[in-house]
Amino acid sequence: MVYTGFGLEQISPAQKKPYNELTPEEQGERGAEMIMNFMTSCPGKSVVSGVTGFALGGVLGLFMASMAYDTPLHTPTPANTAATATAGNIGVGGISRTVQQISDLPFRQQMKLQFTDMGKKSYSSAKNFGYIGMIYAGVECVIESLRAKNDIYNGVTAGFFTGAGLAYKAGPQAALMGGAGFAAFSAAIDLYMKSEDGRPPQNDFKE
């Protein structure tokens, strides 16, 4: 007697119903499934990491800008007297530029300068962190999918591409050095995070 199995090879997978034919519960499950599929895909990981990095970078940049000290500031002041309008400090349009402390300015101008500076620094930091998160997560996911492996080399390669992308405007040498530095940093982080994944020692549960 030849064993032919349980006939599972003759069973065809269930066809998905159109969305408008589903019950409210099934529609919710279908929507959750679509969201999870997108979140676990490479484009989804890249988008989520980019948005998260942008938000964290903005908060960090805002915090660092708010901790700045009162430093000399070059601000244009009207040249009302001949004593201030000297040849060394006259700017464009008859405006003399003098070095002032921020605390010497009117309160409204102080607030305007501070918020403008904080906004610029926060936006710059957010762009950098968002770029790092988006490129790193996307490249790592693509490499992991192609290699079908989850090891340290995925992060090292992603770190190299990310660092090179950040420094490519400064030339090929800077891109190479930036990629190598970011790859080394990524390798160190991965080694630290995976240091507890190994086999426990033999005396782990012994007193």
From Swiss-Prot:
The lineage of its organism: Eukaryota, Fungi, Dikarya, Ascomycota, Saccharomycotina. Coiled coil: none annotated. Residues 1-46, 194-207 are mitochondrial intermembrane. This is Mitochondrial import inner membrane translocase subunit TIM22. GO terms for cellular component: cytosol; mitochondrial inner membrane; mitochondrial intermembrane space; mitochondrion; TIM22 mitochondrial import inner membrane insertion complex. It comes from the Eukaryota. GO terms for biological process: protein insertion into mitochondrial inner membrane. Essential core component of the TIM22 complex, a complex that mediates the import and insertion of multi-pass transmembrane proteins, such as mitochondrial carrier family members, into the mitochondrial inner membrane. In the TIM22 complex, it constitutes the voltage-activated and signal-gated channel. Forms a twin-pore translocase that uses the membrane potential as external driving force in 2 voltage-dependent steps. Mediates the insertion of precursor proteins in a 3 step process. Belongs to the Tim17/Tim22/Tim23 family. The keyword Cell cycle does not apply. The keyword Oxidoreductase does not apply. GO terms for molecular function: mitochondrion targeting sequence binding; protein transmembrane transporter activity; structural molecule activity. Disulfide bonds join 42-141. The chain crosses the membrane at residues 47-67, 152-172, 173-193. Component of the TIM22 complex, whose core is composed of TIM18, TIM22 and TIM54, associated with the peripheral proteins MRS5/TIM12 and the 70 kDa heterohexamer composed of TIM9 and TIM10 (or TIM8 and TIM13). It is found in: Mitochondrion inner membrane. Keywords: Disulfide bond, Membrane, Mitochondrion, Mitochondrion inner membrane, Protein transport, Translocation, Transmembrane, Transmembrane helix, Transport. It is a multi-pass membrane protein.
